[in-house]
Amino acid sequence: MSWRSEQIWIELIPGSRRGSNFVWAFILFFGSLEFILVGTASYFSQNLIAFFPQGMVMIFYGISGLFISLYLSSMLFWNVGGGYNQFDKTRGVICIFRWVFPGRNRRLLLRFFMKDIRSIRIEVKEGFYTRRLLYMDIRGQKAIPLTRTDEVLTPVEIEKKAAELASFLCVPIEVL
């Protein structure tokens, strides 16, 4: 989702709050509860499975699954990776904001001047898992990714996005 005018372009980044992450957290939580229930029932001689070693392993896997589902749920709650990209022509500033894990530096805010942007770069990696990424090259700094690594874009979509951004920022496009 994005909002655009003549002078400002704001692009919202969803982060970890995606439908697939909610589904996996739900499946993992209830699956690990089932593992714990089966392991506990075997301990109390319900004759489902033998407690040693199957019941112990089931309890171990259940507890591990609960910890992983807790981690996934906390990522969803904190919206890790979410934020926005703001391109402001009036002030000549680009702001990239992301939420990260809680702590002293929970907010990640990068600011750059528009005059320091060299180009918008499209990087294509072919192979079994084809990736197309959009970067912003800045003088004296590393390239900053503008798309998520797990975001699958067709060649037409990535070219359109790069062309719109390059024309808005008045910079060239590089393809690697």
UniProtKB/Swiss-Prot annotation:
UniProt-annotated location(s): Plastid thylakoid membrane
InterPro entries: PSI_Ycf4_assembly (IPR003359)
Transmembrane residue ranges: 22-42, 48-68
One Pfam family linked to the record: Ycf4
Primary gene name: ycf4
Topology in the lipid bilayer: Multi-pass membrane protein
Species of the source: Cuscuta gronovii (Common dodder)
Family statement: Belongs to the Ycf4 family.
Biological process terms in GO annotation: photosynthesis
Lineage, highest ranks first: Eukaryota, Viridiplantae, Streptophyta, Embryophyta, Tracheophyta
GO annotations of cellular component type: photosystem I; plastid thylakoid membrane
Main function: Seems to be required for the assembly of the photosystem I complex.
Broad class of where this protein is predominantly found: plastid
UniProtKB keywords: Membrane, Photosynthesis, Plastid, Thylakoid, Transmembrane, Transmembrane helix
Name of this chain's protein: Photosystem I assembly protein Ycf4
